[in-house]
Amino acid sequence: MNKRRLTTATLIMACALNISATGIPATGGKEKADKREAVAQTEYKVPVAGAHEAMMQGRFSPTWESLKGYVTPEWFRNAKFGIWAHWGPQCVEGSGDWMAREMYIEGSKAWKHHREHYGHQAEVGFKDILPLFKAENWDPDKLVAYYKSIGAQYFFALGNHHDNFDLWDSKYQPWNSMNIGPHKDILRGWADAARRHGLRFGVSLHADHAWTWYEPSRRYDLKGDRIGEPYDGHLTKADGKGKWWEGYDPQDLYRQNHPLSKGSWSNDICGSQWGWGNGAATPSQEFVNNFYDRTLDVINRYNPDLLYFDVTVLPFYPLSDAGLKIATHFYNHNIATHKGKLEAVLFGKILDEEQRKAMVWDVERGAPNEKVAHPWQSCSCIGGWHYNTSIYERDRYKSAKTVVALLADIVSKNGNLLLSVPLRADGTYDEKEKAILDEFGAWMRTNSEAIYDTRPWEIFGEGPIASSSIKINAQGFNEGEYAKATAEEIRFTQKGRHIYAIALGWPESNKVTIKSLAKGSAYHKGSIRSVELLGYGKLKAHQDSEGLTVCLPQKKAGAIAPVLKIKR
């Protein structure tokens, strides 16, 4: 059939039914189309309007119904493991995550550290830390090559955090890494390195919450000899005359020219307002447009394969359609740059079942205790999200064994693990992180066939943790339970004719009994042809009504978590 005839027929049918792609009665003509768009925008308190960057038209439109046509690409389902460089200027002081907020909360560790080492927050605010972020030893090519060598199949870079500082040559944020600090396009360095080494490239963007997150920068001391002297969050461009930041407007960074959120002086209120409810200050039209423009700038300039938002559902949702329009642009742009095939992956948190059809569900530092129908991701970190010297000094990093346990558990449930490895401000990891990653990489080199390209088995696992009820807290935060895993805990994956049984520890008896593979099991009714230990070879096994019992060798190959390859 002729394409022109098909298009005409489709339009005739739409007119006959008096509908449009948005579900609003079709009336025809540009003026009436604009009216339909205006009607659609009335659903949102702060819709995108007057932005500089145009949303790309294509297969998808900015509605949930349209976006539910998304299908997770096979490359992501096969990849299973990625590394994240959650790295930026908040690493300078070594105070850990949310440092640029915590440094304004009187009495906090970050506040005390900043006051002692850098000065009073009225005179030295976070804006003054930015020039100290030099990235002087940062070698993205060397880092990405190493991440690939330990098993990463995709790589994520931080584009901006809640601190609102852009780590690229940003068109819409003058407070960026080309103008201040490293004087480098960090995203360009990461993107080029990832693609040189054959890794898919992702960007995480978090700055939409700067609006409320930075509110403590407007506080002042309640104790001491400078009570009531405001911190630097109130400053404007006019205040910079004669200072290093002359010509820059601190409000472009802090975004505090608005009424405070309800309960703003409560230090813990920010989390409960993450979904823009519970009294959170409503972002302005200009701020929403600015984040939208910055995000499309990243998509258009760096063409990421993956895009991550640290939000409930999508940026500014449900106040704005900005997130829906960003998702639409991301998918359509990806299709246009991948020969008509959708290869993009977009992440959001706290998604309902319908929203999980439109994008990929991300769980922070945790996992559901069940198999999940749609592919999903858990993001975690071996330490704090931003580099924390206290974690280093107190040996509080996750062990390689814990990382393997998390990976096996997540993959058994149809998920991927995105692991953050904190970098110091100069762009390097420390020797303790290196030792952990080396050990993890050794395990992956022996056992990765039980991870890559696999799919969940009939059940995800067996053992005390598998049979317990572990709830997700908000967006995650239950991974501590999985760090307690022993050899009793087994996780399953499958590929072709093989089942992989990953024991999350080496049994003292040198025997593994897999109850789910007992004779007459509801999960596997056929025979077991052979069993081998990856990295070792074939093993003796006995199957009866109690389970499949396998004798392990004395030599503890892959002692972190032995993997049995079971041919059926």
Model-identified regions with their sequence ranges:
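N-terminal cationic leader/targeting segments used for protein routing and processing
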Residues: 3-4, 19, 31-33
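Bacterial N-terminal signal peptides
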Residues: 9-20
